[in-house]
Amino acid sequence: MSIRSVIVHDLSQAQTATAQAIALGAPLELRSPPDGAAILGPAVFKAIADDLAQTHPGAASTMILDCGTNAGLAMAALRQGCKDICVDVPTETRAKIAAMAHAQSARLHGPVEIALDLAAAADSRTFNKQSRMKALLEQFLRGDARDD
């Protein structure tokens, strides 16, 4: 089973996605929304990652903070302790950020082509959003669907 990328916007979504992945035995990569470093902030994203590490210690999921094109936010994320970031900057700048990441045992990631964005479930007008989110996650993690 290949690793699946799920975009989470808050702690509740991250917890639900992680729990579903564990239940299905599916590898999971959690990502912030595009430009998540500017939207959530590195400290909030790190707090979500820390919470998951405590509440789901057996989960081997990666939490990737998208820093967009902002090198400053990428460096701030690394200083905050984020271990996985995505940043779209020129090659020379990327090399400098990569060196900083390597020194902190962090990793740079590229963009992802296919991901389930849980905003679709959060924006749903259905009565039970949690059930809809779980159903979308199960379908996606099993490989039965693409981004809805």
Q: Model regions: which residues?
A:
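Conserved N-terminal beta1-alpha1 strand-loop-helix module at the mouth
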Residues: 1-61
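Active-site mouth loops of central-metabolism enzymes
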Residues: 2-11, 59-68, 115-128
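Amphipathic, non-transmembrane alpha-helical secondary structure
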Residues: 11-19, 43-46, 71-75, 79, ...
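Glycine-enriched alpha-helix->loop->beta-strand junction motifs that scaffold or abut catalytic
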Residues: 22-27, 76-85, 104-107
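Conserved anion-binding
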Residues: 25-27, 32-36, 90-148
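Short, solvent-exposed polar/charged micro-motifs at secondary-structure junctions
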Residues: 40, 73-75, 119-121
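Surface-exposed amphipathic alpha-helices with a cationic face
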Residues: 49-57, 78, 98-102
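Mid-chain, well-packed structural core segment of small domains
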Residues: 62-100
